[in-house]
C-alpha cells in the first residue's frame, strides 16, 4: 500500500552558538542541499528554480525512524546521520531552534494524514509528536477530492496562502495509507530596506544573445562582499532584521557563467569556503525584483540521490509507521517552493543571488546583478532555500 510525501517551503531555522547537534545538522544539510540543487537544476534546464532541501530533511528523518533494514540504512546515509538516537536529537534541537528565531516571521509545521480506520504505530506516533511536532489526522482517501481539499487547506494556512493545490486528488485513492506533509514558511524584512521610488527598469542579460528590461531595486547598503576566484564569481550577503537571517547572492563574472557555477556548487563545501572570503563593506546594489515558484518531483530527484528503496514496493519496509501488516512504500513525493524578493525583503521558499561591477566615479563599488545568478536564504548559517534566477 502506498504513502505520499508532500513538502512545501517558505523557510528558516535559527541557532545561537553552534553545538555538536547543530554542526551535525549543518553538515547534513550542506551535503543534501548541494546534491538536491544539482538534481533539481538538471530537471529544469534554462529555468528559474527555487527549492528547499532543508524542508525535505524532517519527513525523511521521520521515514528513517519508521523503516527497518536496508531501507532504514539507506535513508540515514542520505541524511548523513549515524543512528536513530542522533536523528531524534538533531530534529528535536532543530524544532527548538526554529521557535527561538527573532526578527522574522518563521513557521515550521508537520502533519501526517492517515487513512480512515488506521493508526500510527505507538512508538512512531510518540516520536512524531515529541521530536518533529507532527499533528496526526485521519482522512478518508477514497473521497479523494475532500481529502486533497483538507490537506491543501492546511498547507495554505501554514504558508500564508502562498502554496496552493499541493496535492492532486488523482494522487489519492483506496490504496493510499498515509500522506506526510512538511511546511516551512519565512518572511523577512531587509535590515536596510530598498526605497521603492528608486526602483526602475534596467537591462538584465539573460544570455549573450538576449537582454530584457526588469524592475531593479537600487540602494547603498552595508553588506558582506567577496571576489571568489575559485567560483569565477562575486558574492554578497545581505541581512534581514534580527541579524539571524541573510540572503547570499553569487553572481558569475561571465554572462553565461551560471552553468559553470552550478557544476562547482556540486561540492558541498564550495559555498562555506567562499563565505570565508566575505568582509564588511558598503556597496551600491542593483538587484532585480523576482518571484519564483517551482514544483519538484521528489521521487525522481531523491531516487537520483540514491534514495531508492523508500519508493520500491517490498523494499521500503516502513514497518514502524502504522498498526498494519501491509507492506508500505512511498508512491509519490512532491515539493512546491515559492520565493518573492522585493524592496521590503523576502517571502520565501527559496533565496536569491547577484553580481558585481567596480565603479570609478564613486568611493564604493557598484554591484550590478544583471545576469543569471545563484541565491541562498540562510538562518544562522544554515541554508533554508536556494535556487537560481535565469530570467526575473
Curated annotation (Swiss-Prot):
Glycans are attached at residue 85. The record marks 359-360 as: Reactive bond. PROSITE patterns: SERPIN (PS00284). Pfam families: Serpin. InterPro entries: Serpin_CS, Serpin_dom, Serpin_fam, Serpin_sf, Serpin_sf_1, Serpin_sf_2. It is found in: Secreted, Extracellular space. This is Alaserpin. Inhibits elastase. Residues 1-16 form the signal peptide.
